[in-house]
Amino acid sequence: MAQTSTYSYTERKRIRKSFGSRDSVLKVPYLLQMQRDAYTAFLQADTAPQKRSNEGLQAAFNSAFPIVSHNGFVEMKFVEYNLAKPAFDVRECQTRGLTFASAVRAKVQLIIYDRESSTSQSKVVKEVKEQEVYMGEVPLMTDKGSFIINGTERVIVSQLHRSPGVFFEHDKGKTHSSGKLLFSARIIPYRGSWLDFEFDPKDILYFRVDRRRKMPVTILLKAIGLNPESILANFFVNDNFRLMDSGAQLEFVPERLRGEVARFDITDKAGKVIVAKDKRVTARHTRELEQSGTTHISVPEDFLIGRVVARNIVDGDTGEILAKANEELTEALLKKLRAAGVQDLQVIYTNELDQGAYISQTLRIDETVDEFAARVAIYRMMRPGEPPTEDAVQALFQRLFYNPDTYDLSRVGRMKFNAKIGRDEATGPMVLSNDDILAVVKILVDLRNGKGEVDDIDHLGNRRVRCVGELAENQYRTGLARIEKAVKERLGQAEQEPLMPHDLINSKPISAALKEFFGASQLSQFMDQTNPLAEITHKRRVSALGPGGLTRERAGFEVRDVHVTHYGRVCPIETPEGPNIGLINSLALYARLNEYGFIETPYRRVVDGKVTMEIDYLSAIEEGKYIIAQANATLDAEGRLTGDLVSAREKGESTLVSADRVQYMDVSPAQIVSVAASLVPFLEHDDANRALMGANMSRQAVPVLRPEKPMVGTGIERVAAVDSGTVVTANRGGVVDYVDATRIVVRVNDDEAVAGEVGVDIYNLIKYQRSNQNTNIHQRPIVKKGDKLAKGDVIADGASTDLGEIAIGQNMLIAFMPWNGYNFEDSILISERVVAEDRYTSIHIEELVVMARDTKLGAEEITRDIPNLSEQQLNRLDESGIIYVGAEVQPGDTLVGKVTPKGETTLTPEEKLLRAIFGEKASDVKDTSLRVDQGSQGTVIDVQVFTREGIQRDKRAQQIIDDELKRFRLDLNDQLRIVEADAFDRIEKLLTGRVANGGPQKLAKGTKIDKAYLASVEKFHWFDIRPAEEEVATQLESIKNALEQTRHSFDLAFEEKRKKLTQGDELPAGVLKMVKVYLAVKRRLQPGDKMAGRHGNKGVVSKIVPVEDMPYMADGTPADIVLNPLGVPSRMNIGQVLEVHLGWAGKGMGQRIGDMLQREAKTAELRKFLEEIYNSRGRKEDLSQLSDDEILAMARELTSGVPFASPVFDGASEEEIKDMLKLAYPDDLAQAKGLTETRTQAYLYDGRTGERFERPTTVGYMHYLKLHHLVDDKMHARSTGPYSLVTQQPLGGKAQFGGQRFGEMEVWALEAYGAAYVLQEMLTVKSDDVQGRTKVYENIVKGEHAIEAGMPESFNVLVKEIRSLGLDIELERS
């Protein structure tokens, strides 16, 4: 099926040949949709206040207001809120270390009622005061779905938590030694007390509130208003007996008798024995009894003994209670009943199998007598030690489950609750009702009786996602709740004092709650910005950890495991290795959230075996009701499922069904995996564990200097790059007017330009910006002046993108062969050419900060005047003491000069005299300058100076501000120039050929305006021309107004920018000035760096070999990387081998295209070859859309290799790869390269001897990545450094400038060698013998190389610890 849609700007330059068997039915949705939508719904900033729905901020305000005073005569009502424009934009916040946020202002009314006129029914308003009150700052989300908090980019990860509602489960027989299943139920609200019900091993049912002490469930049932009779009536059916003088008559109910063993002869009306004693009653027996018309069965006396009375039996004459409900019948009681003339007796019906007497037994151990007593018992359990007054008891019980302020089931909870207990409606009150509690107990008893099934808590229908918006709303609500208490206290004063709303509301608690959440919550994380893929994955992450979630230690295997409901919702592959495995997941490619927060995945509807284009999103619960075919099921031309049996899923199980039973079908084979996993080609051929590593390591790939598209991709590369926001896309279509390295200017198409607005889009590109991981964020334009663009076209590449596709590595020529042991155990051998060509060179940007503080001894000063430094050491600093931009610095170089006042020392008279003469002040300050760390070097690329308000700026700070303003003015002038040029072009088109009523240069009335006349008049006088047509005159006037408006807005923008730059900066307390220096460090590939492919095939560079020593092919092409073939079979990641073959084919085709271009072949020949590549196999491409020039441009782009897409689970087959290899390497070319018959292997030659290797080697191109584990960051050496305070042993780790640990095993090794002196040295002077090491320094200074080992400090610590246990221990010195 050919691609019918038109190609985008970048696709016209390079089309990726796809092997997908069919076109995607559904485009991959915008990947950051979940984050963006959730926060938009939270803020509702663009919705008019009256139209805002009750969610997010609006819901938080509605829940807190109105606040009523204790006496009820003052009330504070919420009217609406609005969000102010943020003071600084995203870039400014990042530079200045601020939070990108917007102030919330709420309009509230203070209503005071008149005490005298008001009655209890109606209140008379005395006074209303309305005012806007500041309610804290809410951080805003950037376009890329992140937040800027204190200048750093952060992500709020969504949380997967157990949905509110009711859950039934059992302990799987683990609690009791007999293995008996103990059933339990739990009602979980969104906020409020948890209510648990549980059976104990004796089958008594208990409840507990908030996991406190358990109590019999009948106490709760009595507390909600049931008496013992009604409790029994709710849970049991009755057996009706008629008492006789001896024995009784039992009302015959066939179902209850069936299956029981007769304890006596059962006879019919005629006295015929139907069932003999000790025989089991069968269906045949009950049928006989029915046919004989039996209504009652005679039973002996002992059949009644032990039965339980269903209701109170009262003596009709005296009113005395003869037997209470739930009392067991005894001989004495029967005698008493007969004596009182009781004939009809109702007892509860129970049996061992499916009608246990659990509630009856529970009622028997319950000592409470009535509703109030039951509530007192609950009060005592909740508040032990407090006196239970009647008001307190009733209030507590109401607050537990019935008060909307303290208990909220939420919409989701109510929907899940109703669904579970079998109600049809999805809505209802947000608090519990008595019926709800009763229904749950009934279901739990039914479960114990063997009816129904328990819930699976790992089912995604029972786990929901809490997004950014919901988490932020909860925090805001917390802040408002704190305010509510304070306001309530003060509202009473508003009657007497003339207080306004802002006097009553203090916004600090709100700000504190939000600040704490966005800055320090477990779910607010420092954004992983290593590359675009890391960024996008972080925002799509779903975590089960965090507040209200699980903890690593307590999470069992089941929660972490892949569940059938993960299909199409959560990726089964991408999850971290280590303690968080399975707790942190990634959203699948097409997944989205529904209104309740459950994850849904799309399916195509199938009607009578025919697959339609209708798409339904199903949640995990809905999916269980349908039979769903796989995406790769074969269809005929009409879209019908073919074959007798179709592979499908029913209730999560894979099965084969007939086509007519299928109800839905997957939309895409890639639907089950996440973005990172969907970028791994041939994922279907990799072992899951290795695929997991591959997906995770793709996120750690460092952006290299020149990104290169993957030769073998999956087709998701373009989507991921655009959605990550790293590339720049055109907001509107148009023509490129101007391009340079920092800016792209696009003149917008007339049909897309908004009337009266400037028809120009200006895109400022990011240059050398530091990411959170110190990698380089850098954008480069890929358009030329005059290029035509459509909306959404990629116009500039970012870090790790190439022509709008994610490109996290480089395509390397790989040979799978051992090479002198240098690729033993996953080591990697690399050609020197790779390093020389800077293929894996990356730029890292480090930020170094120095602050000048106000100390007790005086202010620190940033200055060039530093004591004891030579002029040579200061020659790179300017007069303000700050290094120049562009300086190349080495370890130890001074970047910013700073001096700190020292404490005054007493001076001798001579020193005083000298200081008086020479005015020397060097002795009272110490040098605390910012210097380059050991082990790092680089180029200074930027300096930022921040000065507190009221402190005078130095020259450097002023110069930075001037440069920034100059740049901004230049930007505005350019914009104005383009806007004016554009406006005058439009005017020229508008006026040419029109008749004028007059104008400049004495233009006569009725003259036709031509281009020559317009050229003779200065452009600014064109507005003075008076066209005859009214409409033209109006258009001319509107253009003039728009231009003037633009000029005015530009002047305002410049003024605002100047104001922002010249105002003082917000700095931490006590800081007067802060200087940030940015160093760019170039990191070349070197031995020790970690590298990996995309299939989990990771390794460390062991050696960089001269290119002439590398194995080479028959035509002289040397390999770039040599990998160990033993790394493939045991790891079972065969995907890498298929990638190598297909990459080899792509490279060969590129070479053939290059040859055609070199011999200047005709375009028709090129077209024919491209048709062969793109349209012989896999998805067809419509190359007729491209002009000859575009074909040539595309061919030039393809000379480096034809890129392929092998979509996940729908990739290239072996046959297709073979066909592509044959197309790429005709016989003559294959022979020249020394390829085998299959073209997948080649005979290589040893670079050192020139001899041919005995066997052919697998060669080809693989996309190989350099990971962010660079040896430069890990290398570290210590001479002397910091020691631990208690043990006096050296600290560990590079960050602490620590030493190497000489551990237990290393000690054993030295013991085994008998190296006693080395061992003594290691354990004493090189570790924690304080006197010993001081002596060693002395000896070294003296030139003596001797050690005197003493007592290790850790021994003293041990002695002290033993003494702390009360054992006296002393060291005897002999």
From Swiss-Prot:
Family annotation (SUPFAM superfamilies): beta and beta-prime subunits of DNA dependent RNA-polymerase
Cleaved signal peptide residues? none
State the Gene Ontology terms under molecular function. Answer: DNA binding; DNA-directed RNA polymerase activity; ribonucleoside binding
Record keyword Transferase present: yes
Question: What Pfam families does the annotation carry?
Answer: RNA_pol_Rpb2_1 (PF04563), RNA_pol_Rpb2_2 (PF04561), RNA_pol_Rpb2_3 (PF04565), RNA_pol_Rpb2_45 (PF10385), RNA_pol_Rpb2_6 (PF00562), RNA_pol_Rpb2_7 (PF04560)
Would I find rRNA-binding among this entry's keywords?
Answer: no
User: Which reaction(s) are listed as its catalytic activity?
Assistant: RNA(n) + a ribonucleoside 5'-triphosphate = RNA(n+1) + diphosphate
UniProt keyword list: DNA-directed RNA polymerase, Nucleotidyltransferase, Transcription, Transferase
Any Gene Ontology biological process: DNA-templated transcription
The cysteines covalently paired via disulfide bonds are none
Write out the similarity annotation: Belongs to the RNA polymerase beta chain family.
On subunit structure and binding partners, the annotation says:
The RNAP catalytic core consists of 2 alpha, 1 beta, 1 beta' and 1 omega subunit. When a sigma factor is associated with the core the holoenzyme is formed, which can initiate transcription.
| Role of this protein | DNA-dependent RNA polymerase catalyzes the transcription of DNA into RNA using the four ribonucleoside triphosphates as substrates.
Listed name of the protein: DNA-directed RNA polymerase subunit beta
The gene it comes from is rpoB
